[in-house]
């Protein structure tokens, strides 16, 4: 009986997180209140135990003995710009381009251990928290926190449970596109990261990831090896850290800088730079 009541409560919370259609005459007027309601609903889906010392110990060992060897089988990973993080004082907001479910473990593994242990990852409440078992798994393995990404539930100066986590000293990894790219180019960036950083006087660290879409494109739930050679090989994945940004100015300007960094690696930032070099160096 207790399980049934809990399941009913979770369903109601998810319904609120997804949002119900508002009447057209009241939609604009109700948007701020609706945003607060959705952020509150997302907070109720949170699993605080995932941030306990025991969960952190499990997570670090899982990263070391399971995730890293698994990623090494499918991809040759490289991180650049880590020296830019040496003088960064937490908490910080990490913003990255998004093309694959592989992005999160790749980014977390590239972070210095001290920074990684205090980093939470914003995850879509309507995607990762619909099923309680999935929610527990992603929260434990990646230290995720639920965020409502639709219909007025985006972040604002009052980000709800995200404000609390930042005040507690947690770093926050965000994907400002709100979803994975389907066409190989970054989509429009939402302003939430810059607004949240300015409200808390925090630094933003832009992160560019290349190669993950080839290893694990949208639609796949497991990585694959390269098949452009007789013997399947590893993909080339690179994580590049940009110059930290002080988000005290215009949010749109800050996010435009971030988008420029995402695009600075190539015409298509989600394609492996190693493959581009090989193509450029091959005879016509």
Where are these regions (language model features)?
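Short gly/ser/thr-rich secondary-structure transition/capping motifs
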Residues: 73-80, 156, 187, 222-224
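Short acidic-hydrophobic, aromatic-tinged amphipathic segments that line or gate anion-handling sites
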Residues: 79-80, 145-149, 247
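Residue-level preference for the first positions of well-ordered beta-strands
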Residues: 91-93, 169-175
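Short helix-capping segments at alpha-helix termini
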Residues: 113-115
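A cross-family acyltransferase "interaction/gating" segment
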Residues: 117, 133-139, 170-171, 182-253
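TIR-domain catalytic/interaction hotspot
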Residues: 156-164
């Amino acid at each position: 009986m207790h399980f049934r009541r809990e399941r009913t409560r979770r369903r109601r919370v998810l319904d609120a997180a997804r949002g119900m259609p508002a009447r057209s005459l009241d939609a604009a007027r109700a948007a701020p209140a609706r945003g607060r309601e959705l952020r509150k609903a997302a907070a109720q889906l949170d699993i605080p135990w995932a941030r306990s010392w025991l969960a952190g110990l499990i997570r670090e060992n899982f990263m070391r003995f399971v995730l890293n060897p698994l990623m090494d089988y499918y991809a040759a990973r490289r991180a650049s710009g880590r020296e830019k993080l040496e003088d960064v004082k937490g908490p910080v907001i990490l913003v990255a381009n998004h093309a694959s479910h592989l992005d999160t473990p790749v980014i977390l593994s590239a972070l210095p251990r001290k920074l990684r242990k205090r980093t939470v990852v914003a995850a879509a409440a309507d995607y990762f928290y619909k099923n309680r078992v999935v929610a527990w798994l992603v929260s434990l393995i990646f230290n995720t926190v639920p965020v409502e990404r639709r219909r007025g539930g985006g972040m604002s100066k009052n980000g709800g449970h995200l404000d609390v986590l930042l005040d507690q000293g947690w770093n926050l990894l965000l994907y400002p596109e709100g979803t994975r790219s389907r066409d190989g180019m970054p989509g429009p960036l939402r302003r939430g990261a810059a607004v949240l950083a300015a409200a808390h006087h925090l630094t933003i660290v832009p992160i560019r990831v290349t190669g993950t879409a080839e290893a694990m494109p949208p639609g796949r739930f497991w990585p694959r090896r390269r098949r452009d050679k007789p013997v399947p090989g590893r993909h080339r994945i690179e994580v590049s850290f940009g110059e930290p940004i002080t988000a005290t100015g215009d949010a749109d300007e800050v996010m435009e800088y971030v988008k420029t960094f995402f695009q600075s690696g190539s015409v298509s930032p989600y394609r492996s730079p190693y493959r581009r070099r090989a193509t450029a160096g091959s005879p016509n």
